């Protein structure tokens, strides 16, 4: 167990003075000092009890008979990287397997909002993930989900978190604050539940996470800032980034598997000269394939540097800035006395190869390989078998009827590649035998939201464009932010029914059916959201899914992540939920057929 600085301080002082030996000394490195913005050559670091005791020239006086010595050989000594906002569930793996995947990439601290599992299992799911996080050798702080469901009245999730639930959870150990406040209209309207949650968080001295997914930077935005959220990761333009910082919020710039928002917003620093101290890098959503093949926060830092940031600035935005934002500056986010001994050794600050990773003074990864033993975490039976459709679905469950017409104008959800927002489109579609037909030639296929929490048998149908499928196929997923019912997208209703029924059989996941044949399946038995297998195994299955989607004509980058967001009724413009088709710009339901 890591001792607080206040308890271990006498021991740190003794080591720094040379009266007692360090546990570990890293010698001959170039110290990346995120406080001064310097690269300090010829630095040694002495560590004891999982914390930095001495950082400076020649730590020979701290070396004793049992001290382990690592020669950095002139390489850079960088603070462990922090992810300022993320959802573990997006990796399709448990917290343990996510940690195993990202430690070799230099991520040593994560700030996690488990609102995905909360929408399925409620407060019990949040506690499960928080308990699991505390068993791990890295720093995983948990935020209490603020909006479950994300938009009351516009969707029904598998569970509801009340203001009382939130208040109770804020007192748990390891809780760092309130998760992203997605109900931005509620904040602007002084909704009593939102006000109560924010007040409880502030009273506890914790941080309120933000989520302002609107291009409107007028009164509603200013009201949102006045309501209390301390950060926001939903910006996509340079003006978004600047507006948030000007209002005293941290602007979180995200590079996830499907979100590429750093390039545009980092110009606030590189071109507009805005002080970088209030900018934080994060991933938000990273799937297992990205983690295994491309990295995690090291990927984000590299990308930020490629967009014009100085390496030291990009590193500050993934270490010190993040720690300061969450009130943890005196505990982590830098290589300085008293802080947790989270340390990366790298030979290149631009390419950022992660060669050695220490967390709390313990060697966890070397040369891109996890060297520590991290045991698996067993989820209880109550977290599994969560897909309850109430019946086997038939092709006719996906009919959209329009009696008495030969052609109708319909609303269509338009997918935007690499972005979370969608477009509200309209198209004219033919009607045959009273049923509206898809138009595959014009890239208009069907989408269905299948209720899967309470076995109601409910199916909401609509149209979607942007996937580019050019054959009979359907993909179904129980990862369907944020309510996590089941989303089915297809060009063929028989395949849609088969895909939905298959996921009920396996207890959740993602499946692609083409012409009655199963092309790919990713089983996600934990809440229908996560696998308890290794990230490498899940990534391989997900890779086969992507290949199958491409074989069916879909060329979108990270298409299945785009698929998973089509029910996210807090991001404009048009979404689907168990209530119906949702106009997010107006926060109200609307009809598929334009009257």
Swiss-Prot record:
Query: Which GO molecular function, any one, fits this protein according to its record?
Result: adenine deaminase activity
Q: Which residues form the signal peptide?
A: none
Biological process according to GO:
adenine catabolic process
Catalytic activity of the protein: adenine + H2O + H(+) = hypoxanthine + NH4(+)
Keyword Nucleus in annotation: no
The cross-references to InterPro entries, in alphabetical order and at most eight, read: Adenine_deam, Adenine_deam_C, Amidohydro-rel, Metal-dep_hydrolase_composite, Metal_Hydrolase
Top-level taxon of origin: Bacteria
Q: Which UniProt keywords apply?
A: Hydrolase, Manganese, Plasmid
UniProt EC number: 3.5.4.2
Look up the record and name the cofactor or cofactors this protein needs.
Mn(2+)
For this chain, the family text in UniProt reads: Belongs to the metallo-dependent hydrolases superfamily. Adenine deaminase family.
Q: Under which name does UniProt file this protein?
A: Adenine deaminase 3
Q: Which gene encodes it?
A: ade3
